[in-house]
Structures are given as C-alpha cells and as structure tokens.
Amino acid sequence: MSQIETKWSFVSAVEETPYGFSFAGIAAGLKDSKKKDLALILAPENSICSGLFTQSIVRASCVDICEQRIKKSSGRIRAILINSGQANACTGDVGIQHTLTATREVSKLLGLNEEEVLMCSTGVIGIPIKLKNLIDNLPNLVKELKINNFHNAAEA
C-alpha cells in the first residue's frame, strides 16, 4: 500500500498560531483510551466566526446550535468547546440538553455570554456525551488555556 503525500504540517511555533487566540486540550475521560479528548479555543474580543454547515437532515444538536448562534450573533463568537469520543448525534433531546449545559458551563467559567460559546462533537454516533466527565473537567480545561497550547488542543 502506498503512502499518500500531504502538505499538511503541525504549527511548530507560537508565532505561527493565530494572534490573540488561546488553546487548551486535556484528557477528560470521554474516551476509554485515556487520550486527550476535550479542547477549548478562546478567541480575542471582537473576533468574527463563520461556519459551513451540512445540508443533511441528520445533524447533531451541536451543529444546529452552532448555526443558530453564529446567525443570531452575526458571528461574534468567543469560544469553541470540542469533544471527541461521543458525536452526540442522533441523541434527541438529551443531546440538545448536553450541548446547552456544556456551553452554559463554559460561558460561566470564562465570563462570557452563553450565546458566544459553540460546541463541536465527534465520535460514536448515537451515544450521548459523558456529560459528568466533561463538566467535571471544564475548570482544568480553562486553566490550561494558553497561546502556546495549540498542540494539546489539536491532539484532543
């Protein structure tokens, strides 16, 4: 089997990360592997966010909530919480409540309006987020926010 060539590479220096952004990535116990599975990106004030969203009728709750918040705020988004392990897709009202609870908790910890926080989830479809693990680890995640923490966020 041949290897595919790629031009992708990791950012290697703080100077190459987006100006004013902070990053964090930790292992929160969302995955059984003990690997990093929770990340947070904090954007500077007055940042503008845009999104490209699937047109599929099968969408995770976080996709719908992200799209609504970006439209409602004209793109004024400050934080993005990212989890891996559970996609939180096809989970009904439970998935919606988990997304809203997680973004509310992040907004409290960062002193932001809840509408300024987005959430992205990837992982096993049909499985709700391990919400207790996620919520319990948010204070540690926020403490890890640093401009030079891009790699930890990327690993999650």
Where are these regions (language model features)?
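Glycine-rich, mobile lid/loop segments that gate access to catalytic sites or pores
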Residues: 100, 105-156
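N-terminal amphipathic/basic leader segments beginning at the initiator methionine
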Residues: 1-54, 58
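Short coil/turn connectors at secondary-structure junctions
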Residues: 34-37, 59-60, 74-79, 112-116, ...
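Short, ordered loop/turn segments at secondary-structure junctions
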Residues: 45, 68, 85-87, 122-124
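Alpha-helical support elements that line or immediately flank enzyme active sites
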Residues: 81-110
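Short beta-strand segments
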Residues: 41-42, 81-83, 119-121
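Glycine-rich oxoanion-binding loops at beta->alpha junctions
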Residues: 53-74
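Short acidic, glycine/serine/threonine-rich loops at helix termini
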Residues: 53, 92-95, 128-133
